[in-house]
């Protein structure tokens, strides 16, 4: 894995890795054990920061979101996570049962499968906005969440004389990249290009692109290489 030597180098130098994900808390907790990562983490597209058992919220509760969606149901055709069981979420996402259960364990957002026209979707998004919420179009889902984004929590984490480096490859990463001191666009697979200005850009995709750019930045800051052998 090209990422592991970079993570070891960061760990030895005291450079924390703070994950900022669209995933749920349950999903990230299942993943981070393999990395040995105990840093704060941001979930559900900037909706909350968890630091141990402490939580700082930037979005609104899923209960409030579902309540707001009730009044829109008669006018629009959509189906959300809250309307179905784990088997259907497995079909929608291609996830195995345990992973689908973690994906369903949401506190600050509701993914919708849109079943209406594009024109209706635009109208729906406007009405959601009027209710103090926002929509975020992902690959498969239209996500409804509070008025937050991946950039807002970065201000909460900001410390004096500390540079924030952010790396991402999708539209929902843009606010985070713009809020960071150093924003890095990781090349996306296929023909998709994230439109962003004054950003560093990788030549590789995915984890290789992440490792490429973090190595470049650590070299720039003269962070020493790890003495750990990943053999």
Language-model-detected regions and their locations in the chain:
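Active-site phosphate-binding/coordination module
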Residues: 1-83
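Residue-level detector of anion-binding/catalytic polar loops
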Residues: 16, 134, 182-183
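Short, charged/polar "capping" segments at the starts of alpha-helices
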Residues: 28, 120-121, 191-193
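Short hydrophobic/aromatic-enriched beta-strand-loop microsegments
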Residues: 38-44, 98-100, 183-188
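Mg2+-dependent phosphoryl-transfer enzymes with acidic/Ser/Thr/Gly-rich catalytic loops
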Residues: 1, 139-231
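Short low-complexity, flexible loop/linker segments enriched in glycine and/or proline
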Residues: 32-36, 113-114, 151-152, 200-201
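Conserved acidic, metal-coordinating active-site core of Asp-based
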Residues: 72-165, 171-172, 179
């Amino acid at each position: 894995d090209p990422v592991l030597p970079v993570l070891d180098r960061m760990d030895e130098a005291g450079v924390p890795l703070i994950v900022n994900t669209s995933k749920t808390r349950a999903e990230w907790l299942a993943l981070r054990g393999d990395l040995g990562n105990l840093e704060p983490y941001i979930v559900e597209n900037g909706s909350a920061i968890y630091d141990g058992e402490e939580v700082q919220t930037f979005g609104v509760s899923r209960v409030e979101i579902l309540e707001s969606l009730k009044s829109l149901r008669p006018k629009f055709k959509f189906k959300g996570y809250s309307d179905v069981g784990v088997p259907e979420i497995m079909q929608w996402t291609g996830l195995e049962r345990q992973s689908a259960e973690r994906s369903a364990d949401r506190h600050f957002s509701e993914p919708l499968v849109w079943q209406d026209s594009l024109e209706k979707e635009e109208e729906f998004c406007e009405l959601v906005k009027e209710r103090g919420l926002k929509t975020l179009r992902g690959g498969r889902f239209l996500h409804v969440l509070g008025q937050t984004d991946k950039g807002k929590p970065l201000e909460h984490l900001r410390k004096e004389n500390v540079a924030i480096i952010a790396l991402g490859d999708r539209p929902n990463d843009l606010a985070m990249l713009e809020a960071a001191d150093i924003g890095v666009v990781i090349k996306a697979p296929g023909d998709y290009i994230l439109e962003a200005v004054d950003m560093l850009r990788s030549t590789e995709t995915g984890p290789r692109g992440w490792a490429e750019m973090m190595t470049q930045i650590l070299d720039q800051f003269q962070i020493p290489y790890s003495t750990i052998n990943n053999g």
